[in-house]
């Protein structure tokens, strides 16, 4: 009985969620031989945004369907909005995989003037987060904060994994090899 429960919890662990995502991105990377073919090809899969992940008190993760997300163009539009092409998704998914595997690399201290990087500073996000954390630290229990962020991480990893799998399958359809690997 104990082994069955442990196996169930392991199936829904953070490590397994990360491994599923990394595996899906590796599969995508091996399948997509010519990434430039992904440019200007829209990726619209609305069912991706209908998934939420619940993390139980013991840390177990359960996936369930919820109501559809807001329509594209709304204030809640994300990076994975249908207006982006498959190439943008491909680059982002590979970048996130690298961040998980190797850690977040530090940006150069002085990017070239006029570049897109010159307007964005990683410490800006950290300052905003530290302000929120200090305000919540006295009010919320650390365990509740942990479960909140764990739930969010599971949700994001689940959506990213599905997005990588969908991109792989769409690429196969676009080049005419829809039955590869099946």
UniProtKB/Swiss-Prot annotation:
Q: What is this protein called?
A: Mid1-interacting protein 1
Q: Name one Pfam family in it.
A: Spot_14
Places the protein is found: Nucleus; Cytoplasm; Cytoplasm, Cytoskeleton
- Function statement: Plays a role in the regulation of lipogenesis in liver. Up-regulates ACACA enzyme activity. Required for efficient lipid biosynthesis, including triacylglycerol, diacylglycerol and phospholipid. Involved in stabilization of microtubules.
> Which GO terms are recorded in the biological process aspect for this UniProt protein?
lipid metabolic process; negative regulation of microtubule depolymerization; positive regulation of fatty acid biosynthetic process; positive regulation of ligase activity; protein polymerization; regulation of lipid biosynthetic process
**Coiled-coil regions listed:** none
Q: Which organism is it from?
A: Mus musculus (Mouse)
**Residues where N-acetylmethionine occurs?**
1
Q: What tissue specificity is annotated for this entry? A: During embryonic development, expressed mainly in the neuroepithelial midline, urogenital apparatus and digits. Detected in adult white fat, liver, heart, brain and kidney. Expressed at very low levels in lactating mammary gland.
Q: Sorted alphabetically, which keywords does the UniProt record give? A: Acetylation, Cytoplasm, Cytoskeleton, Lipid biosynthesis, Lipid metabolism, Microtubule, Nucleus, Phosphoprotein
- Entry's induction text: Down-regulated by fasting. Up-regulated by a carbohydrate-rich diet.
What Gene Ontology terms describe where this protein resides (cellular component)?
A: cytoplasm; cytosol; microtubule; microtubule cytoskeleton; nucleus; protein-containing complex
Entry keyword DNA-binding: no
Q: List the disulfide bonds in this chain.
A: none
Molecular function (GO) terms for this protein are: enzyme activator activity; identical protein binding; ligase regulator activity
Per UniProt, subunit arrangement is: Homodimer in the absence of THRSP. Heterodimer with THRSP. The homodimer interacts with ACACA and ACACB. Promotes polymerization of Acetyl-CoA carboxylase to form complexes that contain MID1IP1 and ACACA and/or ACACB. Interaction with THRSP interferes with ACACA binding.
Phosphoserine (modified residue): where?
71, 74, 78
Which parts of the sequence are annotated with region: Disordered?
Answer: 55-75
* Family label: Belongs to the SPOT14 family.
Q: What is its main location?
A: nucleus
């Amino acid at each position: 009985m104990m082994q069955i429960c442990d196996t169930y919890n392991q199936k829904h662990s953070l490590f397994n969620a990360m491994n599923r995502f990394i595996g899906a991105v590796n599969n995508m990377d091996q399948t997509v031989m010519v990434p430039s073919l992904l440019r200007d090809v829209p990726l619209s899969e609305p069912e991706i945004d209908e998934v939420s992940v619940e993390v139980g008190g013991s840390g177990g993760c359960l996936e369930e369907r919820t109501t559809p997300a807001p329509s594209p163009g709304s204030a809640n539009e994300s990076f994975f909005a249908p207006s982006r092409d498959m190439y943008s998704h491909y680059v982002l998914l590979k970048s996130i995989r690298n961040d998980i595997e190797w850690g977040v690399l530090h940006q150069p201290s002085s990017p070239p003037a006029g570049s897109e990087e010159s307007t964005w500073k990683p410490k800006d996000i950290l300052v905003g987060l530290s302000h929120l954390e200090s305000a919540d630290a006295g009010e919320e229990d650390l365990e509740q904060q942990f479960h909140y962020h764990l739930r969010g991480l599971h949700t994001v990893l689940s959506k990213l994994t599905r997005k990588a799998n969908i991109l792989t399958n769409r690429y196969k359809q676009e080049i005419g090899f829809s039955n590869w690997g099946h």
